[in-house]
A protein has these predicted regions:
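Short, solvent-exposed loop/turn segments at the edges of secondary structure
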Residues: 4-7, 230, 280
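Generic beta-sheet signal
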Residues: 232-237, 283-285
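His/Asp/Glu-rich, glycine-adjacent segments
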Residues: 16-17, 23-231, 240-247
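Short secondary-structure boundary/capping segments
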Residues: 111-122, 249-257, 292-300
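Metal-dependent active-site segment of extracytoplasmic phospho-/sulfohydrolases and closely related
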Residues: 262-300
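Short, solvent-exposed turn/loop segments enriched in Gly/Ser/Thr/Pro and often Arg
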Residues: 1-11, 98-107, 238-240, 289-292
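Stable alpha-helical elements in mature extracytoplasmic
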Residues: 8-12, 78-82, 92, 213, ...
Length: 300
């Protein structure tokens, strides 16, 4: 698969190649319109949002900027996903969910039969589209009402370990690293005030974004009672911070090393929670990246 988010996720979800499943890139050229389009954009099912209102300049994802509408769905995926097949095999009884920091990651893994939720860079909510639901479940509304991301107002991304513990030769400030208008190219990285247009983007480009997604996932497991009967349930959690950090700072950055170290702790927290609520002996855990990452040309 091509090294892009939607391509890798859909290949994992379907077991098919891009030529078969249809997701050949994050954006591609549409012959009918003569324009580039975003992979999972679908104008028919609009975004289901409890708090609407866009922050001007909040979107920094070049693929997302191609979107002309907020609607999202898996209708462009041409092959059945594992989750679709599981739903059929259990006569529709399996509970199927996919969550992520990115919409395209969640949509691909949920397939047509599951429910996808993803983080908003506008308000920090976990959101979905009306393709999946007509209204948020109470537990989702309750989680969003807690406004956990906003509690990081004025805080910063700090190194997990003392600077000397990181790999030698990784300088914490290179001219090719991206500064998200005040996030900086070296530690600590300030999130800034919660009303800053890039506040939620900065949070998601850090280990805090993964921790917020984990907390949402824990609430999902409890509220939907996953794994509590003899029917196989399915949950995909796509942590997005490593991808974002690599794009902005590069694979050889101190930021990348730190976000991986912190993700390791987040995964340990997840596994402990699953063991407590479901039992690891009752759970099949599959780990995978969705794609690789080349070094920054200036570094290589």
């Amino acid at each position: 698969a091509n090294t892009e988010t939607i391509v890798g996720h859909t290949t994992l979800a379907t077991g098919a190649t891009p030529a078969v499943h249809g997701m050949v890139g994050n954006v591609w050229y549409h012959q009918e319109s003569g324009e580039l389009g975003y992979n999972i954009e679908d104008s028919e099912p609009p975004l289901l949002a409890t708090r609407t209102g866009k922050m001007e300049g909040a979107q920094v994802d070049p693929a997302q900027k191609r979107s002309r509408s907020s609607g999202r769905s898996p209708r462009g995926i041409l092959a059945p996903t594992f989750s679709d097949t599981l739903k059929i095999a259990t006569g529709g009884q399996s509970k199927i969910f996919a969550i992520s920091g990115k919409d395209r990651s969640a949509v691909a893994m949920a397939g047509r039969s599951g429910a996808a939720s993803w983080d908003s860079t506008d308000n920090g909510d976990c959101q979905t589209s009306t393709y999946y639901l007509d209204a948020d479940p109470d537990w989702v509304s309750d989680w969003n009402a807690r406004r956990q991301a906003q509690q990081l107002d004025g805080q910063q991304w700090q190194l997990l370990l003392p600077p000397g513990k990181y790999r030698p030769g990784r300088r914490d400030d290179r001219p090719y690293e991206v500064d998200l208008k005040g996030f900086g190219r070296s530690f600590p990285h300030p999130f800034g005030p919660a009303d800053h247009p890039l506040f939620f983007t900065r949070v998601l480009v850090s280990p805090e974004g993964d921790r917020l997604l984990l907390d949402f996932g824990k609430h999902l497991i409890e509220a939907e009672q996953l794994g509590q009967d003899a029917i196989t349930d399915y949950l995909s959690i796509s942590f997005s911070a490593v991808d974002a950090v690599n794009h902005f700072f590069g694979p050889a950055s101190v930021e990348n090393e730190d976000v991986v170290l912190q993700l390791d702790r987040t995964l340990a927290d997840l596994l402990q929670f699953i063991d407590k609520k479901v039992g690891l002996n009752n759970t099949l855990i599959v780990f995978s990246a969705d794609h690789g990452m080349a070094e920054m040309p200036e570094y290589a």
